[in-house]
Design a protein with these regions (language model features):
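Single-stranded nucleic acid-binding surfaces, predominantly the OB-fold ssDNA-binding core
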Residues: 1-108
Length: 108
């Protein structure tokens, strides 16, 4: 199957918790990213802020270290989605989706 598909994500938001670790020769940075979506209710009565938290993983990203990525930093990133499966302590199968960052830039 050689169908063309697209798996691309572009996000800009504020950084939450940052964790940088070395796994063998590879540097891996994981952090949470908060994004907000604003909209007005259909009746126009109120503006609503919908907040989402995303799990971000950056492999060998010197940008994360050299940019001084910290909680509250505003960042812009591009990457792709990856879904992982694992077995929880209670034996149930769980899945989670994370963004694998390809490019990362600290905006402020």
């Amino acid at each position: 199957m050689n169908e063309r598909s697209i798996n691309r994500v572009e996000l800009q938001g504020r950084v939450g918790t940052v964790r940088i670790q070395s796994i063998g020769d590879q540097m891996v940075s994981t952090f949470s990213l908060q994004t907000n979506h604003f909209y007005t209710l259909n009746d126009g009565s109120a503006k609503v802020c919908e907040t989402a938290w995303h799990c971000i993983c950056a492999y060998e990203s010197e940008d994360v270290v050299t940019a001084g990525l910290t909680r509250g930093s505003l960042v812009h990133l591009e990457g792709r989605l990856r879904t992982n499966r694992y077995t929880a302590a209670d034996g149930s199968e769980r899945t989670f989706t994370e963004v694998i960052a390809a490019t990362l830039r600290v905006v402020e």
